[in-house]
Amino acid sequence: MGTPFKRYHIAPVWRGENPQAGRYREFVQCDFDTIGTKSNAADIETLFIIHDLMLKIGFTDFKIRVNNRMILNGLLQLHNLESQSAAVLRALDKLAKSSPEAVIQEMQEQGGLTQQQAEQILALMTAQGTTAEILDSLESQLKGNERGTQGVLNLRELFTAVERAGIPAERVVLDTSIARGLDYYTGTIYET
């Protein structure tokens, strides 16, 4: 099999979690993966596919929120917190449903972070401003960390490609709060 290998499907999938309101064990997922390349072009193509699929199925008022896990991983690396990454990511993944104080507390209790470390990570993950302002701030904070800097560069390339493709800026937004708590997320992350 040659690479990059691309796989697409829509099918029932299952998750190994306890079912709860709005989170079923079985659900239908549209999945497409590119395996065997480290090129940022694959992530940009994924974004274009998401955008085009949303239009094809009739949605016109939607947002694709993006982030890059290399940024958070780089920040954890800078603060010597890589061994606590699972606890930090689980806490950050609750930002939409929990208060910032609760997320900070969980990072401290479950990840062993200091108050200052937890606050710094939360500040980075809830950055506000234009896409360019946020990326500039991230780049400054991650200076000297190759992984985090690469994540910022990948997002800059992605947003440049979005602009060149004529996709309205309000449809693709940088959301640094998207963390995804699973280790198989390694690069660009998308949510609609």
Region locations from a protein language model:
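Positively charged, Gly/Ser-enriched RNA/tRNA-binding surfaces
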Residues: 1-60, 107-192
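Internal, well-ordered alpha-helical segments in soluble enzyme and binding-protein domains
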Residues: 46, 68-71, 88-91, 103, ...
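Beta-rich nucleic-acid/ligand-interaction surfaces
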Residues: 66-78, 178-186
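Active-site-proximal loop/short-helix segments
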Residues: 75-76, 82, 129
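Acidic, His- and aromatic-enriched active-site or binding-groove loops in soluble protein domains
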Residues: 80-108
